[in-house]
Amino acid sequence: MNYTGAIFDMDGVLFDTERIYQQTWHELAEEHGIKLGGGFLKAITGTNGERMRRVVEEYYQVSDGAAVAEECMKRMQEKLSECVPVKDGVREILAFFREQGVRMAVASSSSLRQIEANLAGAGIRAYFEAVVSGTEVERGKPAPDIFLRAAEQIGCRPEECFVFEDSENGVRAGHGAGCITVMIPDLIEPSDQVRPYCSWICRDFFEVRERVNTNVLS
């Protein structure tokens, strides 16, 4: 297995933020007098921009989904300003890849300001040579654009880059980019439909490091 790069999603992969994210969506839903089901959370995870707007308008039954999404992001950032919870194994895998000379990037649907704030708050910004926001590409996940851009920015071929994702939209994007796509499920287990798009499915980054060390591809 040849790999020269590693591209990380942010929410649910680097940081244990998905629960905060979901809680905030539910708070907003209650204010709009609606009850969200699991379908919304699955549809919204990993999206941004126009796709996020459409999902919000469909489930919230509002005419301005962009405004609701903006309010959600604002509230979430306020919560994260107090503490950015780093997921188990993240610091270890970053140090491991750095020792190996692997070039690393973050590719997240969140705004660049939010990504930079979270990375700095967690003290891990220095590991990454590039940070790509969903606002920088024409098409958001599940389109592959964000991972192709990240691979380009760190000077690596997509097929030689790991992509670490927790969402089905992200997995489809990583696979579409031709990357070695690793799903680390957070709150949503992989469906039978998305499993074929995963190179690996790992419980955490400790398992990722073990597989990389032993060259286990399946």
Where are the model-predicted features located?
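Asp-based, Mg2+/Mn2+-dependent phosphohydrolase catalytic module
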Residues: 1-4, 95-98, 111-218
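N-terminal helical cap/lid subdomain that shapes the substrate entry/recognition surface
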Residues: 2-100
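Short, flexible loop segments at the rims of nucleotide/cofactor-binding pockets, characterized by
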Residues: 80-85, 109, 178-181
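Conserved catalytic-core motifs of eukaryotic protein kinase domains, centered on the activation segment
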Residues: 19, 108, 117
